[in-house]
UniProtKB/Swiss-Prot annotation:
Disulfide links within the chain: none
Family: Belongs to the COX15/CtaA family. Type 2 subfamily.
Subcellular location: Cell membrane
Origin species: Mesorhizobium japonicum (strain LMG 29417 / CECT 9101 / MAFF 303099) (Mesorhizobium loti (strain MAFF 303099))
Protein name, as recorded: Heme A synthase
Transmembrane segments: 21-41, 107-127, 138-158, 174-194, 207-227, 268-288, 301-321, 323-343
Keywords attached to this entry: Cell membrane, Heme biosynthesis, Iron, Membrane, Metal-binding, Oxidoreductase, Transmembrane, Transmembrane helix
């Protein structure tokens, strides 16, 4: 009679490890493309190119204008929006082409991310390389990507009628969702990686997760700063307007609007957010080194603090230099590096996803 042995070795373990390595490698490629997409999106914003394409054509929009007549048609559409009539009137078609290519590249890269994610996902699913429990996570990321495309057009549409730029609310939402997709992808990839040490204690896990949350909030605040050009408002540090706490922070009515619409208040809150991330990362490093001396968790916590310190220095430099394009892009890109490492560290404190278990029948 057959007996069930739960302790029998899982015969497919090697296959599962190989599948995990393949899926993890694919997700790392997705992360690289996402990182490039965020950088190109930042350059599109900083060069004020985001409104140069006034239509959303998911399929036909892949093909740019191919002759003079098509370029004139595209330019005429741009000439009908407030950004042209109020800011760029008299722009030459050559100048228009320079901003058009940034936005076109951003949209093309966004479409590419969708393909880089969806097609391998379909292949891995059909070939049964996606283990149980992983499918919903990956489908969730795919759905977030679809939502991000819709939010991207929702953001662009806000600048086509009554404004000369996009809504800072929508810009911050678009940037934060990109960061959330990046975080989710990193967490899944890290969960599939081998871990050299057991999971950390609950307190270390919670604080590591809290840093991820703080980093996401700080990126949202950075989106508001970008949307309002608030980085150009006060280019001194550590003082603002000659004070630690500047005046007129609540000048708008109702008061909540100041935290989203006042450049001074938004920059001040972004500074406070940076100080908070710095302080919590420092505390996390000290606490982890005390609880788990010499561990991989402690080394990662130390590196995370160093990354936060570097990012803070880049932010201060960007402010003092009055937001040059290369510094602003570096600040945005390094924010994603800090976030990605924080997410990987948090998943690392929890350990790898359990390997699938199988009950083996023996006679």
């Amino acid at each position: 009679m057959a007996a069930i042995s739960a302790s029998a070795p899982y015969v497919a373990r090697d296959r599962d490890l190989r599948n995990r390595a393949l899926v993890r490698g694919w997700l790392y490629v997705v992360l690289l493309v996402l990182f490039a997409l965020v950088l190109v999106g930042g350059a599109t914003r900083l060069t004020e190119s985001g409104l140069s394409i006034t239509q959303w054509q998911p399929i036909h929009g892949v093909i740019p204008p191919l002759n003079d007549a098509e370029w004139q048609e595209e330019f005429q559409r741009y000439q009908q929006i407030p950004q042209y009539t109020e800011l760029n009137k008299g722009m030459s078609i050559e100048a228009f082409k320079s901003i058009f290519w940034w936005e076109w590249a951003h949209r093309l890269l966004a479409r590419s991310v969708g393909l880089v994610f969806a097609l391998p996902l379909l292949f891995f699913w059909v070939s049964r390389r996606i283990e149980r429990g992983l499918g919903p996570k990956l489908v969730g990321i795919l759905l977030l990507g679809g939502l991000q495309g819709a939010i991207g057009w929702w953001m662009v549409a806000s600048g086509l009628v009554d404004r000369v730029s996009v809504s800072q609310y929508r810009l911050a939402t678009h940037l934060t969702l990109a960061a959330l997709i990046f975080t989710a992808t990193m967490v899944v990839a890290r969960g599939l990686a081998p871990h050299s040490e057991p999971a950390a204690d609950r307190s270390t896990q919670r604080l590591a997760g809290f840093i991820v949350l703080l980093a996401l909030i700080q990126i949202y605040l950075g989106g508001l700063v970008a949307g309002l050009d608030a980085g150009l408002s006060y280019n001194t540090w550590p003082l603002m307007d000659g004070k630690i706490i500047p005046g007129d922070l609540l000048i708008l009515e109702p008061a909540w609007r100041n935290f989203f619409e006042s450049p001074k208040t938004v920059q001040f809150v972004h500074r406070l957010g940076a100080y908070t991330v710095f302080a919590v990362a420092l505390w996390h490093m000290i606490a982890t080194r005390r609880r788990l001396p010499g561990s991989t968790h402690a080394r990662r916590a130390t590196l995370l603090f160093v990354l936060v310190l570097v990012q803070a220095s880049i932010g201060i430099g960007t402010l003092l230099m009055q937001v040059p394009l290369h510094m602003a892009l570096t600040h945005q890109g390094f924010a994603l590096i800090v976030l990605g490492f924080a997410a990987a560290h948090w998943r690392g404190t929890k350990g790898a996803y359990p390997l699938p278990q199988e009950i083996v029948l023996r006679s």
